[in-house]
Amino acid sequence: MPWIQLRINTNSDDAETISDLLMEEGSVSITFEDGKDTPIFEPKLGETPLWRDTVVVALFDAETDLTPTIAMLKTLPFLGENFSHKVEQIEDKDWVREWMDNFHPIQFGTRLWICPSWREIPDPTAVNVILDPGLAFGTGTHPTTALCLEWLDSLDLSDEEVIDFGCGSGILAVAALKLGAKNVTGIDIDYQAIDASRANAERNDVADKLALYLPEDQPADLKADVLVANILAGPLRELAPLIAERVKTSGKLALSGLLKEQAQEISDFYSQWFDMDAAAHKEDWSRLTGKRK
């Protein structure tokens, strides 16, 4: 069935109020969009921030008469008589199929492919990780994940012990195992990430080599030959002593989740423990690598 979509240009202060009112008016779905392509980086714990310029998008049944709803919105003092909005009809589609069509196998480096389960594997002789998009965790499409995957592909991981610090979907942990790592330890603060990592490891037949922990449960004597941490600049700085402690002498380190302008400061900080390399960049993001002193 077709739908009617109402788009309202507003700001972060009023978006939630408008959303509540539209739900009362019969909207079956509300989403928020960025009005001016403004990124949000490193929100505080527990925050779900909105963009300063936010578009509220409401979906209604096609039979809905929006005239009373728009009249009601015009009476709101923070919108006013001439508030910016757009009404359009949306034809029904197989939304699941359309969503799936957006994801294709992606190659990282020379050996590694990340493939959705519904796609044919392009190169059966390559190192193939089967991973479906889900939750808010990495699937290889974000530049920081891509930078880490390319780095892992460049290493000889045969018989190496690896730590994936902030494992999320487990994409880096699973990739390391498929690339030959002896074992991987994944650590994350989110129990959903632990579950997602375990499920993806099982799908790729490497679950027997993957140990997963919440931070408070990780072994005190844990050490690895290779450690990759794709988190954010704040946690990378805060956790630096612990991360350094986890890497064996002459072990390898990769840090990502960093904006370009944050890379030098983090590199300088980690140079207490590591011989740091020049940063690698992709779009606005950076990856740092180093060798444990």
UniProtKB/Swiss-Prot annotation:
Substrates-to-products reaction catalysed: L-lysyl-[protein] + 3 S-adenosyl-L-methionine = N(6),N(6),N(6)-trimethyl-L-lysyl-[protein] + 3 S-adenosyl-L-homocysteine + 3 H(+)
Taxonomy, superkingdom: Bacteria
GO biological process, one term: methylation
InterPro entries reported in the protein's UniProt record: Ribosomal_L11_MeTrfase_PrmA, Ribosomal_PrmA_MeTrfase, SAM-dependent_MTases_sf
Enzyme class per UniProt: transferase
Keyword tags: Cytoplasm, Methyltransferase, S-adenosyl-L-methionine, Transferase
Alphabetical list of PANTHER family matching this protein: ELECTRON TRANSFER FLAVOPROTEIN BETA SUBUNIT LYSINE METHYLTRANSFERASE (PTHR43648:SF1)
Name of the protein this chain belongs to: Ribosomal protein L11 methyltransferase
Protein's organism: Shewanella baltica (strain OS195)
Designated gene of the protein: prmA
